[in-house]
């Protein structure tokens, strides 16, 4: 029986994520060039400039990225309720692969950093997959990669994003403010009431959601979690013009072509001036790079292969084992989410932040190159 074709919404999502990934590559490369040019002083000064009481970098990471997480939440809700993750048979393979792809990189990192109190808090940095970057690489490879593997990678990355949100909420939360948390709970109750009352206009949700972000910012829980929480309250119906679909389609180009590239430009810049090989081989950048390059592929491919071998899940249609491995390697492109978690873990420590960037850039770049080489040498098992 032929596999079910992805919906037009899902195809649009794949296309926008892939195009956004290519733009992200360009802006990240531009940030590296500027950070190592005579313009580096102006670049870093601009990121630390104050605006409305916070630095530009802080505003991007806490403000714009909340919109990114809002889109992530909308995608998760859509896929779980009516898309590629709407039943258990569709969830098993990407779900198990995502779990393996989070656990093994963390173990690789901890193997090198467990005895270092200064660096151990970065254990979650190599557990992430950048869906835009990975799909951008697949887009450059053209039709040699089966659509089923693109859907598998997208579903895995969406589950991975959900895991990252849980990690941020549970392990990277500052000192809690109980009055602010009470305000968060009250605002969430109001959003839930709007949903129960079947309010279909987006403006009430967005206005109340802005208040949720402000309360979350004061609560000690990272403000980007507000984006996920807001997304869960946006109504989704069967029709194409439901509030969730309208908001997702409205946000997708702004996030893919604007917010994510801006984040990459602001966070990928690291100066290599005076960077010695001994610093690159320290446990923090090495643990991140090896976690992304080896931990991800071992965790994703090993878990997926075992699930298929044991009969728990079916191999993506038209995909060979080598192609599945190639996509597993691409999951080591952590970039956006890895840099974001690294900023949460070491944001106040410039030296550690630079080490994180070096590890993320090295692990992500090597994963992209190796994964591409594997897939370039593969042919579909059906051909």
Curated annotation (Swiss-Prot):
Gene3D superfamilies found in the cross-reference section: Na+/H+ antiporter like domain
Localization in the cell: Cell inner membrane
GO molecular function terms attached to this record: sodium:proton antiporter activity
Example GO biological process: regulation of pH
Catalytic activity annotation: Na(+)(in) + 2 H(+)(out) = Na(+)(out) + 2 H(+)(in)
Alphabetical keyword list: Antiport, Cell inner membrane, Cell membrane, Ion transport, Membrane, Sodium, Sodium transport, Transmembrane, Transmembrane helix, Transport
Main subcellular location of this protein, as a coarse class: membrane
InterPro entries named in the record: Na/H_antiporter_dom_sf (IPR023171), NhaA (IPR004670)
Pfam families: Na_H_antiport_1
Protein topology in the membrane: Multi-pass membrane protein
Gene Ontology CC terms, in alphabetical order: plasma membrane
HAMAP family cross-referenced by the UniProt entry: NhaA (MF_01844)
Role: Na(+)/H(+) antiporter that extrudes sodium in exchange for external protons.
Family under the similarity heading: Belongs to the NhaA Na(+)/H(+) (TC 2.A.33) antiporter family.
Protein name: Na(+)/H(+) antiporter NhaA
Organism: Paramagnetospirillum magneticum (strain ATCC 700264 / AMB-1) (Magnetospirillum magneticum)
Gene, per the UniProt record: nhaA
């Amino acid at each position: 029986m032929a596999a079910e074709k992805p919906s037009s919404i899902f195809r649009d999502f794949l296309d926008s994520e892939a195009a956004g990934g290519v733009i992200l590559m360009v802006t990240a490369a531009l940030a590296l060039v500027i950070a190592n040019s005579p313009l580096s002083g102006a670049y870093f000064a601009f990121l630390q400039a104050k605006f409305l009481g916070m630095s530009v970098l802080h505003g991007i990471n806490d403000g714009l990225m909340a919109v990114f997480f809002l889109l992530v939440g909308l995608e998760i809700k859509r896929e779980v309720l009516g898309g590629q993750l709407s039943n258990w048979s569709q969830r098993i393979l990407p779900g198990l692969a995502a779990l393996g792809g989070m656990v093994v990189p963390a173990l690789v990192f901890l193997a090198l950093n467990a005895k270092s109190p200064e660096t151990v808090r970065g254990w979650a940095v190599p557990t992430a997959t950048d869906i835009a970057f990975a799909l951008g690489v697949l887009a450059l490879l053209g039709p040699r990669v089966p659509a089923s593997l693109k859907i598998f990678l997208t579903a895995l990355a969406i589950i991975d994003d959900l895991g990252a949100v849980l990690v941020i909420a549970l392990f990277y939360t500052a000192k809690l403010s109980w009055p602010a948390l009470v305000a968060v709970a009250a605002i969430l109750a109001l959003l839930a009431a709007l949903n129960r009352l079947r309010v279909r206009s987006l403006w009430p949700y967005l206005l109340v959601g802005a208040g949720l972000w402000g309360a979350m910012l004061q609560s000690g829980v990272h403000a980007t979690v507000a984006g996920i929480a807001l997304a869960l309250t946006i109504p989704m119906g069967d029709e194409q013009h439901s509030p969730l679909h309208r908001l997702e389609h409205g946000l997708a180009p702004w996030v893919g072509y604007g917010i994510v590239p801006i984040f990459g430009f602001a966070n990928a810049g690291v100066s290599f001036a005076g960077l010695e090989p001994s610093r690159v081989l320290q446990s923090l950048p090495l643990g991140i790079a090896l976690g992304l390059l080896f931990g991800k592929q071992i965790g994703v491919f090993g878990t997926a292969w075992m699930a298929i071998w044991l009969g728990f899940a079916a191999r993506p249609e038209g995909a060979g084992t080598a192609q599945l491995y190639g996509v597993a390697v691409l999951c080591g492109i952590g970039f956006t989410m890895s840099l974001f978690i690294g900023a949460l873990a070491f944001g106040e420590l410039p030296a550690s932040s630079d080490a994180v960037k070096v590890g993320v850039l090295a692990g992500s770049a090597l994963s992209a190159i190796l994964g591409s080489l594997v897939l370039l040498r593969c042919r579909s098992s059906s051909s």
